[in-house]
Amino acid sequence: MKFMPHEYQKYAIEYIKSHPVTALFLDMGLGKTVTTLTAIRDLMYDTFEVQRVLVVAPLRVARDTWPDEIKKWDHLKCLACSVVVGSVPERRRALQQDADIYIVNRENLVWLYENSRLDFDMVVLDELSSFKNHQSKRFRAMKALRPRVKRIVGLTGTPSGNGLMDLWAEFRILDMGKRLGRYISQYRNLYFQPDKRNGMVVYSYKPLPGAEEAIYHQIADITVSMKATDYLKMPELVSVAKEVSLSEKEKERYDELKKYLVLELPGGEVTAANAASLTLKLSQMANGAIYTDDKDVVTIHDRKLDALEDLVESANGKPVLVAYWFKHDKDRIRKRM
């Protein structure tokens, strides 16, 4: 497919190319991934400024979204990627591949830092808010890796879903403490005051008057922030298909019920009496659970729950309305969320 960038995408691409440190805050639907990949391609094959790029993302985004975007767009097909997920042997094999871009899920960043001898001259953090906890192992691993990296891009839709305090860790990774300070205590003392406390024990902080404007001013020179409502003429509703894939075993069960109208499961037998019943049973299986003939619920997979969890996380505190088909869908969603 031919990529026809919007003007805001052209601006963001050039911004990444001209800024060694970039915080790119784009709403859902504004094309963060293809924008970043286009900048990577230009830096790699036009100006020859980078040779090896590391992308850190949530598991399903790392495994599916980034590789799919590279395959989707004609101008990106020159980029070779290796997806570093799965078991330790699978990850080791992925790192041994000759690639332009290595894509790792954030849960394996610590492992990558401790076990990989590869040098990366550019890092992309897809969902920068994953690094808002300055006490997490992944934050410490990225903090240690950061001085060896020439270029870094942080992607997110909503950078401070839980307030301004989150920004410190995110920008500590990006600019190594240049703008908001090297230490969280320094940042707190400068921009916040104690809120809820019990004697000398402080449970929460609130921004000082004018702190928000001062913080945004400090990070403005490396930040691009765009909202979909400002840059896209959008209809009242935009439908985006979020596909999930079943494992071989899950697909075999689905096909067996579809073909024979009966399926033996550990939790009981499932029978479809007619075409209408079969459609309902297959819909249940696609959603992840199914009612047996005895009205018990048997879980088949969590694929849609995993995808929903990613969507809720990317909303970063914004309201999300979730519709469900079956009662067991509601129960499983509530249990997961």
In which residue ranges do the predicted regions lie?
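Conserved helicase motor
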Residues: R60, C81-R91, E107-W111, K132-Q135, ...
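Conserved Walker A/P-loop ATP-binding site and its immediately adjacent core
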Residues: T35, V50-K72, G161-D166, W325-H328
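Conserved helix-turn-beta segment of the N-terminal RecA-like "Helicase ATP-binding" lobe
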Residues: V61-G86, L174-G177
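Conserved helix/coil segment N-terminal to the catalytic DExD/H
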Residues: V88-M122
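Conserved pre-motif I regulatory segment
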Residues: M1-F25
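Conserved P-loop NTPase motor "coupling/switch" region that bridges the ATPase
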Residues: R52, C78, M122, S130, ...
